[in-house]
Amino acid sequence: GPRAVPTVDEHRVYTLGAAGMLSCFDTETGDLLWRVDTVTDYDATVPVQGTSQAPIVEENLLIAAVGGEPDAKVVAFNKVTGDEVWRSLDNISETGYSAPIIIDAGGARQLILWHATAITSLNPKTGEIYWNQDFTIGGGMAITTPVRSGRYLAVSQFFNGTMMMALNPDRPDARMLWKGRNRGELPDQTDSLHSIISTPIVVGDHLYGIGSYGELRGIDATNGERLWESDQMNEQDRWATAYFVRHRDRYFVVNDSGELILARFNPDGYEEIDRTRLLRPTTRTRGGISGRYRDRAVLWAHPAFANQHVVVRNDETVVRLSLASTDYQ
């Protein structure tokens, strides 16, 4: 089954499984419409933590980070038949775990793929490379989703920190504004934002997110300068995670303790409006692959928000809860 969020397009749902199986199902019946085994068909290398990138639909294409050979790090398929339309990028480095996104910038649609050695922009219709910025990261751990807001395009990583790109307004191109520096992974050894699973947010000229050990930080997006830090949102521990979803002038945040937090973020600090428990975490970190870190229970599944409800799950239960104030009067 998939670690990545399924992708729904009209009456089809697409999943990219943890072992590299790309499947298309009918949403009404659950019938399998087509399937591609990326390991068998593309000699794909499954990452240590399992394939985790959600595929993306663009017009008649389903685009997936495959990590295959030859030159098939990313592949576009006909979304109806599953036939290959194009492939692009050599696979000399790990593909990572970050889902591709599509943006409009510089007068063009751009497919943005962040992988273990670079962030790359491609033409989603053809796979042609528009631009490429080297960014070699530790452990192949490109996990968070690239974030675009206005001229900014940001990626953030546990060991290497954040890299901020400035998108060219006139053509499909970009330049690096800044990237983080660090002496290690601990909070007192990092300068900007070192996210691992939690995708940060960009609001105006500021970047906000959860760092390597649970520290919530506000960053000047123009130069990477840290403006403030708070330890109030998350438990302060390795691999801390929180998911941010914008709602009007504030954000819904679900942290890895299973709490829903209503908050605002601004250059002066973090404003918590309220919080409540949604679900108790049941997945355990087991101290990581090496087993040398503290074992704790975490909630790492991204919530879904729709129709004034939140849907959240652990590895035992799925719950839907109302967010409408009228339900609590």
Enumerate the language-model features and the residues they cover:
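Short coil/turn segments that connect the beta-strands within blades of beta-propeller domains
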Residues: E10-H11, E59-N60, G107-R109, G150-R151, ...
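Blade-level signature of beta-propeller repeat domains, shared across WD40, Kelch, NHL, RCC1
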Residues: T162, S257-I261, R292-Q329
